[in-house]
Amino acid sequence: MNYSHTPAGYNSFSEYYDALMQNVGYDERCRYILEIFKRLDHDMGLSLDLACGTGSLTIELKKNGVDVYGIDASYDMLSHAREKAEENGLDILFLCQKMQSIDLYGTIDTCVCTLDSINHLVKMSDVQKTFERVSLFMNQGGYFLFDANTIYKHREVLADNTFVYDTDDVFCVWQNSLKENNIVEIELDFFEREGKVYYRESENFCERAYSDEELTTMLEKAGFEVVKRYGDMTFEAPKSDEQRVIYVARKK
């Protein structure tokens, strides 16, 4: 059976994305990324935030002096990103392109792709294409940093479980269904209160977890070598029950 999603959609998700992600801590994640590259003695130079969503990390990187621009496949996500950048008085370029077919104006020195964006590609061929496109525009010696949800997380944490998120802005029911090939089908129901009435909107998409061997092999085929693997937000090797792994790959 084939599973797919259309990232150009996310109409409802884009409206509530920031509310659901308010505990991510983008400033802390930005500092973490900067520290990784500091330890590698790498000048980020011209950088790309791939699958940037509503631009929260892009904005934090820009605030910290990184020459960065963002790409996402969702017009709706990018609309919010542009508004937020303007509110922060920042001039950031945002482009609407799919990960697996990015076409940049020139080369880059660094690419970051965070918060399980790679997992949204449920076809291995699309992951390979994404790695190859990033490699095509990456200067030799440049770095590609991304994170990925693990098979453990998909099988043991998300699985067939349901989660509820209750914020000041929205009430969300997050339902997961574990399918073949470590794919999780995700159904989101958003309930927004206006007076005494609740309005419901729904969104659904799929994510796929890949093994370390699969990701490493695809990176090598694209001309990268993995130089670091960390447990999320740490500088230690991933544990057996790690839910998200950070990959740092260098362009050969």
Show which residues each predicted segment covers:
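C-terminal lobe and adjacent flexible extensions of AdoMet/dcAdoMet transferase-like proteins
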Residues: D212-K252
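SAM-dependent methyltransferase
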Residues: S125, L145-M218
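Class I SAM-dependent methyltransferase SAM/SAH-binding core
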Residues: L48, S56-S101
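Conserved class I S-adenosyl-L-methionine
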Residues: M1-A51
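Residues lining the SAM
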Residues: T114-D116
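A short acidic, Gly/Pro-enriched loop at the edge of an enzyme's catalytic core
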Residues: D103-T110
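A short glycine-rich, Lys/Arg-flanked "PGG" loop and its adjoining helix->strand segment in the class I
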Residues: Q128-Q140
